[in-house]
Amino acid sequence: MAGKNDGKIRCSFCGKTQDQVNRLISGPNGAFICDECIDICAEILEEEGVDGHEDKSSAKDDINLVTPEELKAFLDDYVIGQDQAKKVLSVAVYNHYKRVLAGDTSDVELQKSNILMLGPTGSGKTLLAQTLARVINVPFAIADATTLTEAGYVGEDVENILLKLIQAADYDIERAEHGIIYIDEIDKITKKSENVSITRDVSGEGVQQALLKILEGTEASVPPQGGRKHPQQELIPIDTTNILFICGGAFDGLEKIIDSRMDTSSIGFNSDVKSKTELNVGEAFKHALPQDFVKFGLIPEFIGRVPITVSLEALDRDALIRILKEPKNSLIKQYTKLFELDGVGLEFTDDAVNAIADKALERKTGARGLRAIMEAVMLDLMYRIPSDKSISKCVIDKDTVEENLKLDGDCVPEAYIEEKAAS
């Protein structure tokens, strides 16, 4: 502001002239601000809890890097079995974040090693990834590969999976750039055919091609509200170089490809003859090679960007029983706590736990199906207990489980509900 028709330079905020203040600082379009107004602004910011002089800590400072042994020990508290998978994951995650924290100080460029997890439904793929992110203290997001399509077609762009990570980091881009993304159902975006086709495969090979850049590391532009990009939209830039991608899938049928290759390669006098029935899915996955994934429908460029392969075993009856009882947040412990909050004790007999595990095996849903079974078993009790203050303890046995898993199942038998003694 030039002044009030007197030719003097004044502060654009308080109107004082250059003679009345210690200093005037010029800005764009002929604007000025004096030192007194600057002090007032600083006081306002300080009162609102904004300190412009405070050094912001780097997002790297939040990363809790622990040794592979410590990582596996933490996984053991929450995930039952899968020891070899835990070791491989612990080493891979440790090396990834060691590389992130080292930055560009090394003469040797350390390449990112994304992870491919193979295992049947309910074997613990998602839980392993979630638990790793929690102990490392980085943002974590889950994406479903089946919703993705190539840019320009109906469905989600691959950049939308980055938006989920940004949201998990509360829009702190620096934190998001050190996060973990788990892409589930990755086996569902395979090529529809090994042969070259003239028709466009927008949800298969097209998605794999679109994922290549962000898996490897690139400066991506993400729509802040999701959906498709458009020219008038402000985009969020994010560097994916230090984001760890863990891709998981059941890969149904891959074991047949592996078996076929191994049977062919084992022909000869000195071959180790082994029938296909002796090689279960978990064992077959341990022998998976890049050419097996290519035959399954993943493109070679995609396989090259997920160099670490982790195979998970299908959970057997003993593992399911341990999952129900042993982890820190096991389902039985969770339901026991819920009942405690209502002042009621809860007990499961061994036969009841065995029956729940058997039902999960029958449904072939692995650990994921245990909660649905438990909900069906506990529903009537959880409905009744908050209103009935006379109940002091509930005992769940095999008959209780079987009765409540029937479509016409009635309430838990009265004999297994202990009532409080009359006062």
UniProtKB/Swiss-Prot annotation:
Q: Main role? A: ATP-dependent specificity component of the Clp protease. It directs the protease to specific substrates. Can perform chaperone functions in the absence of ClpP.
Q: Which SMART domains match?
A: AAA, ClpB_D2-small, zf-C4_ClpX
Entry protein name: ATP-dependent Clp protease ATP-binding subunit ClpX
Enumerate the GO terms in the molecular function aspect. Answer: ATP binding; ATP hydrolysis activity; ATP-dependent protein folding chaperone; protein dimerization activity; unfolded protein binding; zinc ion binding
| Superkingdom in the source lineage | Bacteria
Binding positions for Zn(2+) per the UniProt entry: C11, C14, C34, C37
Matching PROSITE patterns, A to Z?
A: CLPX_ZB
Q: How does it assemble?
A: Component of the ClpX-ClpP complex. Forms a hexameric ring that, in the presence of ATP, binds to fourteen ClpP subunits assembled into a disk-like structure with a central cavity, resembling the structure of eukaryotic proteasomes.
GO aspect biological process, one term: cell division
Keyword annotations for this protein? Answer: ATP-binding, Chaperone, Metal-binding, Nucleotide-binding, Zinc
Give the organism the record lists: Agathobacter rectalis (strain ATCC 33656 / DSM 3377 / JCM 17463 / KCTC 5835 / VPI 0990)
Q: Which gene encodes it?
A: clpX
Which parts of the sequence belong to the ClpX-type ZB domain?
1-53
Q: Which family does it belong to?
A: Belongs to the ClpX chaperone family.
Q: Which residues bind ATP?
A: P120, T121, G122, S123, G124, K125, T126, L127
In terms of InterPro entries, this protein maps to: AAA+_ATPase (IPR003593), ATP-dep_Clp_protease_ClpX (IPR050052), ATPase_AAA_core (IPR003959), Clp_ATPase_C (IPR019489), Clp_protease_ATP-bd_su_ClpX (IPR004487), ClpX_bact (IPR046425), P-loop_NTPase (IPR027417), Znf_CppX_C4 (IPR010603)
Q: Quick one: a GO cellular component term? A: HslUV protease complex
